[in-house]
């Protein structure tokens, strides 16, 4: 006969698995918006070599989001890109 503890553990695991399968997943654009540097505009701008203007690009952590183009100075740092809209 199945013990009470075994039934409780199985129900708990079932709830965890069902809950994990139905978690909302963020889109890539939402993730990049969350990590966009917009606290101080003077620190979030970067030089985009395409047009040679200082501060014409915007620093994004990760890759450039959709609708943005990566500047020819592709990697701003090890973790960020210089992108322009």
Curated annotation (Swiss-Prot):
Domain of life: Eukaryota
Disulfide bridge map: 46-82, 48-71, 64-83
Disulfide bond is among the record's keywords: yes
Entry keyword set: Disulfide bond, Signal, Toxin
Residue runs in coiled coils: none
Molecular function per GO: toxin activity
Signal peptide range: 1-20
Disulfide bond listed as a keyword: yes
Pfam families reported for this sequence: Toxin_4
Protein's job: Probable toxin.
Protein name: N.vectensis toxin 6
């Amino acid at each position: 006969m199945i013990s009470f503890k075994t039934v409780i553990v199985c129900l708990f695991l079932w709830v965890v698995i069902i809950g994990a399968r139905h978690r909302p997943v963020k889109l890539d654009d939402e993730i990049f918006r969350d990590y966009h540097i917009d606290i101080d505009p003077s620190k979030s701008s970067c030089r985009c070599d395409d047009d040679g203007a200082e501060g014409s690009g915007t620093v994004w952590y990760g890759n450039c989001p959709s609708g943005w183009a990566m500047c020819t100075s592709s990697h701003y740092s090890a973790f960020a890109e210089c992108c322009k809209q």
